[in-house]
């Protein structure tokens, strides 16, 4: 395997938004077995180092392709678009206002009579929006509307971050 291979090439899958998760998982397990550093323990230092680098690349590729957000960023980067998380924010005012409202709702969950129900309701709405954003990204990417896909990616980042915050709050509430 070439260390310079793109992530889709590593997993022998087509470059596309839609990834067959079972195929990705199966190929990952196969590559892990083939390039696990322990298999190279009796080899020379160069081979050991290459095995570690290859295993690291395989892990990075897998984590990127299995995550909708990371996969979207990677697809845009393959099109020479800087999709790093700090590179953009959305200019959609209505979307940004909704994000503020959702964060206020999140901050008030602890004060709710049933914080777990409030959190679940919030999660359901955010997951629905995130799913819609992923569908939008897929359509925009497939139609080569990369600027629009880039803007949708910014929205996906907001939603993914909010979902992480919801999970963190849920863990905090369970620990109380």
Q: What residue ranges belong to the model's regions?
A:
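C-terminal accessory/regulatory regions appended to core domains
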Residues: 1-176
